[in-house]
Amino acid sequence: MKAVVFIIDGLGDRPNKQGNTPLKEAHTPTMDKMAKEGICGIMNAVDIGVGPGSDTAHLALLGYNPYTTYTGRGPFEACGVGIDVKAGDIAFRCNFATVDDNLTIIDRRAGRIKNTEELEKAIDGLKVDGVEVIFKQSGGYRAALVLRGPNLSDKITEGDPHKEGVPIPEVKPLDNSEDAKRTATILNKVIKIAHDKLNSHPVNEERRKNGELPANAILPRGVGMVPNIQPFNEKNDIKGACIAGTGLIKGIAKMVQLDYIDVEGATGTPTTNLKNKADALLNAIKTYDFVLINVKGADEASHDGNYELKKEFIEKIDKMLKYILENIDKNEVYITLTGDHSTPIEKKDHSADPIPIVIWGKSVRVDAVETFDEFSTYKGGLCWIKGENIVPILLDLTGKAHKYGA
């Protein structure tokens, strides 16, 4: 038996004035079929009352306790862009930004610069006070930064004020340890050296000539020490894989040593190629015991406050699920359909509202739920669960769980 965890990123929502959500209003005959034939419930990925990030949510959905394994977003971003991170590294996500001569931020995204490969080379490989600087752009103005060396700490502040019109803040230690003081000093030096190198870089000289904003600074944030996480396959004694279009989810998969399946046209946006992702899933379950697939577009629509786009994208996912169900044997595969968090249109950000969930496959205890939405599935047999419960439930259903006790 195989298990699939199908994540519709940002799926859940809050009712509008008419009492509807994009999911409730969408035409979703396949999701409703799964609800009728499966066991339903509602879920909070991390915990009741906690609005999680996609990082902490996916750790929980993979069976890890985010309160003990999550150190910050930086390590997962760095891993996702292809940096071979090691336990003890200090990692950050970064923006290329535009600053003036006083390091006051003019634009946090450097005019949404498209190509930063040459700028990356100016920073990657630096040595500062015996610490190696690893830097990799991840498309456009985004990048990841890793500090590697002895006596480092993630107990430091960020180098990003998250707003414009203010200077790049001085990075400071958050405790009195020598490691934190040393790391803060090193990161401040990296920010200064990066500005010196980027400010006079030929790419930026050319941008100035063309009337474009220079990408002459970096803003590190999301600091975290790379955690030592038990590999997913070792933890569960199964072979697992991940399909996703976003670097963050890719990084989480790599961090827990799931095989990452690259899919052409998987963009992490509403224009992602759902057919290619579906085919990748169908191929993956031939050789893997467990596959997590993340589809991101609904979350993007939510962050933009676009109700109709979210509804339409959910309907596209329903057609994708129809294609998947038509090409698998229900007696051989369990599919868990849920989200990682709610992203209400009214809030344009993640919330703690629980998410609908259904587990579809043979021998599940089918309940009386007939539609898949935020208002129906809570009546189902799964009741109210947490993300960490999903993998153990699937291991039990697929006959791969070990008895606890004598």
Swiss-Prot record:
Pathway(s): Carbohydrate degradation; glycolysis; pyruvate from D-glyceraldehyde 3-phosphate: step 3/5
Keywords assigned: Glycolysis, Isomerase
Biased composition (Basic and acidic residues): 156-165
A Pfam family that the UniProt record links to this protein: Metalloenzyme
NCBIfam families: apgM, PRK04024.1
Summary of the function given for this chain in its UniProt record: Catalyzes the interconversion of 2-phosphoglycerate and 3-phosphoglycerate.
GO molecular function: metal ion binding; phosphoglycerate mutase activity
Catalytic activities: (2R)-2-phosphoglycerate = (2R)-3-phosphoglycerate
Protein name per its UniProtKB record: 2,3-bisphosphoglycerate-independent phosphoglycerate mutase
Keyword field contains Cell inner membrane: no
Assigned EC number: 5.4.2.12
Listed GO biological process terms: glycolytic process
Region of interest: Disordered: 156-177
